[in-house]
Design a protein with these regions (language model features):
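Glycine-rich, basic loop-to-helix element that forms the pyrophosphate-binding segment
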Residues: 30-46
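Short loop->beta transition adjacent to catalytic acidic/histidine clusters or analogous donor-positioning motifs
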Residues: 1-4, 13, 23-26
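Conserved nucleotide-sugar donor-binding catalytic segment
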Residues: 103-186
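Acidic helix N-cap motif at the loop->helix transition within catalytic regions
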Residues: 11-20, 59, 63
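Conserved donor NDP-sugar-binding/catalytic core segment of glycosyltransferases
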Residues: 63-95
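The conserved acidic donor/metal-binding loop of glycosyltransferases
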Residues: 55-59, 83
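Short aromatic/hydrophobic "clamp" motif used to bind/position activated sugar donors
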Residues: 51
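A conserved acidic beta->alpha catalytic loop
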Residues: 7-16, 33, 55
Length: 258
């Protein structure tokens, strides 16, 4: 495994820590140019067949890389990704995060979910280096927007597929400042801009089909949400022994239909 660490103008002792492992890793130090620039620097330096982006404060399991590579070899022209766990600043597990499993969908159906804002945690992905020759990371201020722009462009403009590994392979560390209203609002603005940019690059008849199907999908989602909200409100008005039985009944039905 080739490990490339980009020190993008750090002001703490990060570079010193990296240099203590200099016999095992490749270190590149540059002035602060932002996340996309650091990614491009690392990608240009890499010599292997697979690219794995990994943030400095997240955690992998000993089997993460092997699991990703084994699965990626089964699916050509495909970015593989996995479920993950959320941990806090101290490493305490907050919750497991299970991605929606769209493996049975066609590429077109999956792309509709991406257009609707479906997010993929880039830290869980493994990307063949050949795919990075088709599609690259664009310079944006928002790290989430960089991920989303790359995945949406890969799918709609480069014809790349996606495949979920149901196993949790990453511990993703979340910081309190990431949850601020300002950051979330900024990301949503970026996502809207990205969707419009990608759609405008498509042929008119393909773009019109995507827009039509996206509206239909969002309408269906809205109906399901309203039905669920009504059901939850109804359950809240019934005695607990009744609502518990109803929930158990429907959970069993869901399991049977999987």
């Amino acid at each position: 495994i080739e490990i490339i660490c980009i020190d993008d103008g750090s002001t703490d002792n990060s570079l010193e820590i990296l240099e203590s492992y200099s016999d095992k890793i490749t270190i590149i130090s540059q002035e602060n140019k932002g996340l996309a620039s650091a990614l491009h620097t690392g990608i240009k330096q890499m010599k292997g067949d697979w690219f794995k982006w990994f943030s400095p404060d997240d955690v992998m399991y000993s089997y993460t890389i092997k699991t990703l590579v084994d699965e990626a070899k089964k699916h050509s022209n495909t970015i593989v990704y996995s479920n993950w766990e959320i941990i806090d600043e101290k490493g305490n597990k907050l919750r497991a995060f299970h991605e929606s499993n769209y493996n049975e969908l066609s590429d077109f159906e999956y792309n509709i979910r991406l257009l609707d804002g479906q997010q993929i945690n880039v830290n869980t992905t493994l990307i063949a280096s050949s795919l990075l020759e088709k599609c690259s990371f664009r310079e944006l201020d928002d790290p989430v927007a960089i991920d989303y722009d790359f995945f949406l462009s890969s799918a709609l403009l480069c014809g790349i597929s996606f495949h979920l590994i149901s196993k949790s392979l990453i511990k993703y560390r979340i910081h309190s400042e990431q949850l601020s209203h300002e950051n979330i609002s900024k990301t949503l603005d970026y996502i809207s801009e990205i969707v419009n940019r990608v759609l405008q690059k498509l042929d008119a008849h393909i773009r019109d089909r995507y827009i039509h199907e996206l509206k239909q999908y969002q309408k269906t989602k809205s109906t399901k949400r309203k039905t669920m909200e009504f059901g939850l409100k109804l359950l809240s008005l019934t005695p607990s022994w009744v609502s518990d039985r109803i929930l158990i009944f429907y959970l069993n039905k869901i399991r049977q239909n999987r």
